[in-house]
Amino acid sequence: MAKKVQAIVKLQIPAGKATPAPPVGTALGPHGVNIMQFTKEFNAKTQDQMGMIIPVVMTVYQDRSFTFITKTPPAPVLIKKELGLNSASGEPNKTKVGQLTKEQVKKIAEIKMPDLNAANLESAMSMIKGTARSMGVTVEE
């Protein structure tokens, strides 16, 4: 018989740096999950992606066991990493903070492809371009 799902928890945690302190502890504590076990498993699974923010979808079962799936980093994080930016533009229409080439957009789209609901690489690239423009990054056509 399948386990009964108690909750689905979504978090964004820096890769390899999950600790029982907030926000992880406060999100998982009410569900009775073994927080130390989760942090060890998450840190081991994301060790190779240090410095990136990794979204996690965690399924908590009624017997307090859990499973989790890591997703690809958010597009803005990948764009900022690619351009070496600390933050996006506060006024994207007025202040531009960088420029992405078509190759850089393609590279980011290929990384994000498993998590995007895009039918092909072209539509994934279009989504990445839109995200970049909303951050104040110009995109080479």
From Swiss-Prot:
InterPro entries for the chain: Ribosomal_uL11, Ribosomal_uL11_bac-typ, Ribosomal_uL11_C, Ribosomal_uL11_C_sf, Ribosomal_uL11_N, Ribosomal_uL11_N_sf
Record keyword RNA-binding present: yes
Keywords: Methylation, Ribonucleoprotein, Ribosomal protein, RNA-binding, rRNA-binding
Segments passing through the bilayer: none
One annotated GO biological process: translation
NAD is among the record's keywords: no
SUPFAM superfamilies, alphabetized: Ribosomal L11/L12e N-terminal domain (SSF54747), Ribosomal protein L11, C-terminal domain (SSF46906)
Pfam families named among the record's database cross-references: Ribosomal_L11, Ribosomal_L11_N
A GO CC term assigned to this protein in UniProt: cytosolic large ribosomal subunit
Molecular-function GO term, any one: large ribosomal subunit rRNA binding
Post-translational modifications: One or more lysine residues are methylated.
Entry's family note: Belongs to the universal ribosomal protein uL11 family.
Physiological role: Forms part of the ribosomal stalk which helps the ribosome interact with GTP-bound translation factors.
SUBUNIT field: Part of the ribosomal stalk of the 50S ribosomal subunit. Interacts with L10 and the large rRNA to form the base of the stalk. L10 forms an elongated spine to which L12 dimers bind in a sequential fashion forming a multimeric L10(L12)X complex.
Name recorded for this polypeptide: Large ribosomal subunit protein uL11
